[in-house]
Amino acid sequence: MIYLDNAATTLHKPPQVEQAMLDALRTAGNPGRGAHEPTLHASRLVYAARCAISKLLNAPDPSCVAFAANATQALNTALGGLFAPGDHIITTVCEHNSVLRALYRLRDQEGVQLSFAGVDEKGRLQYDGWQELIQPNTKAVVVTGASNVTGNG
């Protein structure tokens, strides 16, 4: 079989992922929801993950690491908490729908201003003119690092 939908999900998981999934099914516990061993074990695993991620990102404390169900939820949480009315964001029309919807909501409901940087006919960033988009109230440039649609990075 030729599998061409890795953008949605990876067909074959590494053995470590398979094992972690089996372990989770066998020892399921809900972190922070009780004092029985499965819950305590799950809480320890979550804390260990927070510590590892905190160290990797040089965060000041493991409590600074927040988990979300998926990238869209994480993105909406981050964008929703960063900006105030009158703030300015630079982005492109080639961003993922989850990014653009969040930014349009900020514009339409929160009074955030958006500017769109140029891309060429293949969706590649065009850096000419970016400097002119920066305003005194610019708080972020929200641009994808690589597109799973065009393959551009």
Residue ranges and their predicted role:
Residues 1-153:
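Pyridoxal 5′-phosphate
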